[in-house]
Amino acid sequence: IRLRRGTADEAYALVARAAALVEQAGLAQAAVQFHDPSGAFRDRDQYIFVFDRSGTYQVFGSTPGNVGKSVFDVRGLDGDFVLREFFAAAQRGGGWVDYEVVNPVTGAVDEKTSYILPLGSERVIGCGVFKPKGGFSLQA
């Protein structure tokens, strides 16, 4: 049985592969693959995102048209919290960050968690999963 949603383990693995590709090929070349809707970096509801310290998206795997937009413009997302906590996780070498965002499928505010890695000191790369009701435990 294949779940309709990606899992935390799959998000973690996707971010690790994506960060390795950026290191090998550079962000511009990697972004082409991250934005390919049938590519290796899109899996069900999972996709890669990258943004800089100002909160500007440089990659938004599910919606490439959001590149250049700000985390502050994402409906139902606390941009200040996300920016602060994602970069704090990156400064620790990577980690999980829990937050709330409007689920684009249901329109409800849902809990989400994203695995974040640093891309140098000025960018973060990540992938998130909506948390099931009742939660789950994360290990990284």
Language-model features: locations:
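Extracellular/periplasmic ligand-binding regions of membrane signal-transduction receptors
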Residues: 3-33
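Extracytoplasmic ligand-binding sensor domains of the Cache superfamily
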Residues: 38-92
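A short beta-strand signature within small-molecule sensing/ligand-binding domains used
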Residues: 46, 106-116
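Membrane-interface helix-start motif
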Residues: 135-140
